Curated annotation (Swiss-Prot):
It comes from Salmonella enteritidis PT4 (strain P125109). Required for optimal enterobactin synthesis. Acts as a proofreading enzyme that prevents EntB misacylation by hydrolyzing the thioester bound existing between EntB and wrongly charged molecules. The keyword Flavoprotein does not apply. This is Proofreading thioesterase EntH. GO terms for molecular function: 1,4-dihydroxy-2-naphthoyl-CoA thioesterase activity. Keywords: Cytoplasm, Hydrolase. Pathway: Siderophore biosynthesis; enterobactin biosynthesis. The active site is at residue 63. Its EC number is 3.1.2.-.
């Protein structure tokens, strides 16, 4: 297991109370040896005006996953901040849920890179993101 902090899924989800994460309905669903996953509903909260998943909502899910994964890689007295987010949208989603899968690309002492892939309910890739974070403290 790569994580330096050990939290349960319930504890991870509790951190989202009264935040954008909760407003968008994002729920952490899996914390594996080197993977963090979450789901987000595709509904009125996350739609753009034409009834499709808003790219900004996809980006919010990606940044949520990458930032929390980055936090889990820090020690006491440290935190992470996002420095760059890139998102490539591959396929439209109009309903259901999307699942985000976050994996490390680089875990340095001062910076990290994460790949976050979003999948629709049929398991099709709908968005690929990369998040860069800086380790502070």
């Amino acid at each position: 297991m790569i994580w330096k902090r050990h939290l349960t899924l319930d504890e991870l989800n509790a951190t989202s109370q009264n935040t954008l994460v909760a407003h968008l309905g994002i729920v952490y669903t899996r914390l594996g040896d080197e993977v963090l996953e979450a789901e987000m509903p595709v509904d009125a909260r996350t739609h753009q005006p034409f009834g499709l998943l808003h790219g900004g909502a996809s980006a919010a899910l990606a940044e949520t996953l990458g930032s929390m994964a980055g936090y889990l890689m820090t020690r006491d007295g440290q935190c992470v901040v996002g420095t760059e987010l890139n998102a490539t949208h591959h396929r439209a989603v109009s309903q259901g849920k999307v699942r985000g899968v976050c994996l490390p690309l680089h875990l340095g002492r001062q910076n990290q890179s994460w790949e976050i892939t979003l999948f629709d309910e049929q398991g099709r890739r709908c968005c690929t993101c990369r998040l860069g974070t800086a380790v502070m403290g």
